[in-house]
A protein has these predicted regions:
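Active-site and adjacent substrate-binding regions of carbohydrate-active enzymes
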Residues: 1-218
């Protein structure tokens, strides 16, 4: 075996949301659903273009972002509370300490899954372990299920493309080779099947339109 086989993921239960990791310096997508779709589709294209077994974490396919916790009491994660206390002991004030844990807490990815616009995202009629994200009604699964142009359907389309017989030898099993002439803000690589067939993937991670110099015949 000349190549390994990995578990490919951007998010899991011990990580904050990928939107907030990879687009921290970009325009905030919280109130701009079109921008959130563009950012989410970029991450989805990157994820689905890599070699290995792809894992999509709950809420990732909806474009979930980090939550907004207003006090340390709203958190459940013990490590988050410990980090908060450590920040206070280091001399940071309460607002600064809360900002630190807001950015990195594991509870960001452990909030209830937003199924519907109903209370608690339709997850439970009882008291959930954590509150729902503030924007759950705007991105809930039911709403995206009904919108063929949603991020949820974009993920589904990418999965179909990846599994399609015409693409699977490249997109699932093919070699990954970096495209050298891409701009710094663009992640570009090609997937190469054993028979030489290639699929190029270009992902713009900036907040501006970029022009790609794609070689003839690529």
């Amino acid at each position: 075996q000349t190549q390994g086989w990995g578990a490919i993921y951007l998010e899991n239960h011990d990580q904050s949301r990928s939107f907030n990791k990879y687009f921290r310096e970009k325009a905030a997508a919280r109130d701009d659903l079109h921008l959130r779709f563009l950012q989410g589709s970029a991450l989805a294209t990157l994820l689905m273009g890599l070699r290995g077994t792809v894992f999509v974490y709950q809420g990732e396919e909806l474009g979930s972002e980090n939550g907004k916790f207003n006090s340390i009491e709203e958190y459940d994660d013990l490590n988050t509370k410990d980090q908060y206390r450590r920040a206070l002991r280091a001399g940071y004030d309460e607002a600064q300490s809360l900002k630190f844990v807001n950015d990195r807490s594991r509870d960001n990815s452990r909030m209830p899954f937003p199924w519907t616009v109903e209370a608690n995202g339709g997850f439970t009629s009882g008291m959930p372990w954590l509150k729902c994200n503030d924007d759950y009604a705007a991105i809930c699964a039911k709403k995206q299920e009904q919108d063929k142009a949603s991020l949820l359907h974009y993920y589904r389309n990418l999965i179909r493309i990846r599994k399609d017989e015409a693409n699977r030898e490249s997109l699932i099993y093919g070699e990954v080779r970096e495209i050298q002439n891409a701009l710094e803000s663009v992640i570009a690589f090609e997937r190469i099947a054993e028979n030489g067939e290639k699929i190029q993937i270009w992902v713009n991670m900036s907040d501006e339109t970029q022009q790609a110099d794609i070689a003839e015949g690529a």
